[in-house]
């Protein structure tokens, strides 16, 4: 397995990973706030947002490190804030709301609830690095109906990116996705399975209000929505005993009481790749035109505001 250690504000590899529960997507809308007020609510006024084209009917968007704030749609659309998994890591690492990552989330959820805003999507994920789940077994059990769920919809997909199982339709307010994260990332020989609960609307708001550590909250919602079970003579399938692996997963998730923010997935290698591959030709031309000494002076005197994403690397 692989783990991520905070070092220079980035992610670094270690030999043994901890299983963690983390927020992995947040999307919410407001009809009463400006984009600037949303940025303030995120505690991210100090970072360099760029203005770009919006999506899904919004004309404009403010963007920084996988966080998008869309605006200028129809009058009834308001402002839409969307944070992908990496956007969630950005928020945890750079937000000035609090010093502790979990307290940052609490403060943001309090803001959302206090104004009655709508959470259009909230993903909470459990990462299994220790070998609790065999993704092939989970897939076979799903196809054989060895589970109970609030939803009748299921699908299993096997591809070059690994195996994924989804219980719950894309339209439902709650769905569970189980997939081989290592295969998705192209990390051969690594055990990394993810169990993800995706919630919408009132279900997402309800999750944000659970007064428990994130591991217990995740385990409780998962047990209520989906269980893998062993066949039994009881006519009520919900009373069938749980599969050992599902019991172990729930038990493991429950004990995760401290929210461990993995940190921004921005490291030296990505920085180097960007400079060499994206800007390399322009840099080479500048050095040839102005000379190395003058080029270095131009970089030192640049008027662009510092980007915390890069500052994290050199702390």
Model-inferred region functions:
Residues 1-266, 274-315:
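Structured, helix-rich domain cores that form ligand/interaction pockets
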């Amino acid at each position: 397995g692989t783990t991520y250690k905070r070092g220079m504000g980035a992610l670094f590899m270690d030999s043994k990973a901890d299983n963690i529960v983390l927020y992995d997507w947040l999307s919410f809308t407001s009809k009463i706030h400006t984009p600037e007020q949303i940025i303030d609510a995120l505690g991210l006024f100090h970072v360099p947002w760029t203005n770009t084209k919006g999506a899904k009917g919004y004309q404009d968007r403010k963007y920084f490190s996988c966080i998008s704030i869309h605006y200028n749609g129809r009058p009834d659309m308001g402002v839409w804030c969307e944070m992908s998994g990496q956007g969630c890591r950005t928020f945890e690492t750079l937000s000035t709301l609090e010093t502790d990552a979990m307290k940052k989330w609490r403060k943001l959820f309090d803001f959302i609830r206090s104004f009655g805003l709508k959470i259009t999507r909230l993903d909470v994920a459990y990462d299994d690095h220790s070998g609790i789940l065999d993704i092939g077994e989970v897939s076979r059990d799903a196809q054989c109906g060895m589970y109970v769920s609030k939803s009748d919809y299921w699908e299993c997909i096997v591809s070059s990116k690994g195996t994924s199982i989804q219980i719950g339709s894309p339209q439902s307010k709650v769905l569970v996705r189980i997939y081989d994260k290592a295969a998705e990332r192209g990390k051969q020989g690594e055990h990394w399975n993810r169990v993800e609960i995706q919630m919408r609307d009132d279900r997402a708001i309800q999750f944000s209000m659970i007064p428990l550590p994130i591991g217990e909250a995740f385990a409780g919602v998962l047990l209520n929505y989906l269980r893998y079970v062993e066949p039994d003579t009881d006519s009520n399938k919900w009373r069938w005993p749980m599969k050992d692996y599902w019991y172990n997963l729930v038990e493991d998730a429950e004990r995760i009481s401290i929210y461990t923010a993995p940190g921004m997935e921005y490291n030296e290698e990505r920085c180097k790749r960007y400079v060499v591959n994206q800007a390399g030709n322009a840099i080479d031309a500048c050095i040839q035109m102005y000379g190395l000494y003058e080029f270095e002076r131009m970089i030192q005197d640049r008027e662009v505001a510092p980007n915390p994403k890069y500052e994290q690397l050199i702390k």
